[in-house]
């Protein structure tokens, strides 16, 4: 008998294929393979505990790679800070990183939010031609929205 978890993963696999979401497709396939070869009991807890941190580390490596390769150096940084657009980008990068930090805590403390974020991302990609920016920023935005709703509720509650 196929478990509910496997059926859910197969549904996500179909959605990933329909939405042409490569990241979701790879993630679902990796998890299904781990489950089917019987090492899920050992691997899944590790992913749950360390997965987000490892993912953030990989993203950070990708962001720092142009510095390591020499594509971005002090000269480019100096040129960039002379542009008003660069200052907007710098501020945006700071804000997004701070929002995403709140998302990490939300994902760790409220794992069912991950499912809603994945479904929202899939919907946006499949229906609205959106871009999957990842669950951290989505969780961060959700966290901020929840805090604003709580704050507004304190006036009317």
Curated annotation (Swiss-Prot):
Q: Which residues cross the membrane?
A: 1-21, 54-74, 87-107, 117-137
Against InterPro entries, the record matches this protein to: UPF0756_TM
Q: What broad class describes the main subcellular location of this protein?
A: membrane
Keyword Cell membrane appears in the UniProt entry: yes
Keywords attached to this entry: Cell membrane, Membrane, Transmembrane, Transmembrane helix
How does the entry describe its membrane topology? Multi-pass membrane protein
Q: Which GO terms describe its cellular component?
A: plasma membrane
Concerning Pfam families, the annotation shows: DUF441 (PF04284)
Whether Electron transport counts among this entry's keywords is no
Q: Where in the cell is it found?
A: Cell membrane
Q: Which family does it belong to?
A: Belongs to the UPF0756 family.
Enumerate the PANTHER family for this protein: UPF0756 MEMBRANE PROTEIN YEAL
Name of the protein in its database record = UPF0756 membrane protein BH3161
Organism expressing this protein natively: Halalkalibacterium halodurans (strain ATCC BAA-125 / DSM 18197 / FERM 7344 / JCM 9153 / C-125)
